[in-house]
Regions:
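Structured helix-beta-strand junction loops
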Residues: 11-12
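Asp-based, Mg2+/Mn2+-dependent phosphohydrolase catalytic module
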Residues: 3, 7, 16-122
């Protein structure tokens, strides 16, 4: 479903990757999945030396992409790294809840169990 959702989102939004992964591995994974062309920029923790959920990497990503915090949405499947990190800097979050987790310490902006739900949310 990822490619279907990305082909819907890419013409409407600027899409970026913010990952704790390594550049070579992330690029390879994206190319093999056929999704590398949908993203405008890849920002990795190795670029800054700080990993999500630390606020510095979110601020760095906003600056590197010339994005506004209030207009940004972190979509992620890691509660701690993606959702807690984004929440900590005041960024909207969309939690891809593959585990079916229900014990949230706070309510994310959006929560979904299927990536196709992004099309309806956005």
């Amino acid at each position: 479903y990822a490619e279907e959702v990305l082909s819907y989102l890419a013409p409407k939004y600027n899409l970026y990757i913010l990952s704790n992964g390594f550049r070579e591995l992330q690029s390879c994974k994206m190319r093999s999945a056929g999704i590398d062309t949908y993203f405008d920029k890849i920002i990795l923790s190795e670029d800054l030396g700080v990993m999500k959920p630390w606020p510095e990497i979110f601020h760095f990503a906003l600056s590197a992409t010339q994005s506004e915090l209030r207009e940004s949405l972190m979509i992620g499947d890691s509660w701690e790294a993606d959702i807690v990190g984004a929440h900590g800097v005041g960024m909207h979050q969309a939690y891809y809840n593959v585990s079916g987790r229900t014990d949230f310490p706070f309510r994310p902006t959006y929560s979904m169990t299927d990536l196709k739900e992004l099309v309806e949310l956005l």
